[in-house]
Amino acid sequence: MKKQTLRIGVGGPVGSGKTALLRSLCSAMRDYYNIAVVTNDIYTQEDAKFLTQHEALDADRILGVETGGCPHTAIREDASMNLAAIDQLLERHGALDVVFVESGGDNLSATFSPELSDFTIYVIDVSAGDKIPRKGGPGITKSDLLIINKTDLAPLVGASLDVMAHDAKIQRGDRPFIFSNLKSAQGLDEIIQIIVSEGMLEAKEIPAAKAVV
């Protein structure tokens, strides 16, 4: 029976911490799972270069897709470029356990095509204000996991984490959300646990994740 690769879509606004999250996840999981990454940028491959330069994975496990125009189209209406990139990674590395697909910076209405993503993570950050969860949108309400990142900035911007938690619960119902601060690895172990359990990956004894950003 052919092994199924778990495809995880990672979306969120520009600057919310998507690429930093991928760097952290790859660093923590790469010795235990066969992983690759596809990044999306409009006119550059900056996110792919960032991950390569910081040795999140070997360079041949990271592919950058230049979407041109609207980045939403490449993850939703026409995912062909991303699907081709995944196929290329599978040809290189055989049966991958996980492929992360990072979207270009998007808004709260962005969603991944089911053809492209089996599990979706949406990243917002505290610096945008504590009203973001209540604004809703598919990224907030429908993603499999919502990450509220950069909790260390809450006092600096006057944001209430209690308000954000309250609104996230209302918007998401039973769907999980996690507060994170990747600079201290806060929330990272819990994120990995959810990916493994919900993605039906083989459970392994992974040490506590360390901050790498």
UniProtKB/Swiss-Prot annotation:
Alphabetically ordered keywords of this record: Chaperone, Cytoplasm, GTP-binding, Nickel insertion, Nucleotide-binding
Membrane-spanning segments: none
Entry's Gene Ontology BP terms: urea catabolic process
Top-level lineage group: Bacteria
Pfam families: cobW (PF02492)
Localization per record: Cytoplasm
Subunit structure of this chain's protein: Homodimer. UreD, UreF and UreG form a complex that acts as a GTP-hydrolysis-dependent molecular chaperone, activating the urease apoprotein by helping to assemble the nickel containing metallocenter of UreC. The UreE protein probably delivers the nickel.
Family: Belongs to the SIMIBI class G3E GTPase family. UreG subfamily.
HAMAP family: UreG
Functional description taken from the UniProt entry: Facilitates the functional incorporation of the urease nickel metallocenter. This process requires GTP hydrolysis, probably effectuated by UreG.
Protein known as: Urease accessory protein UreG
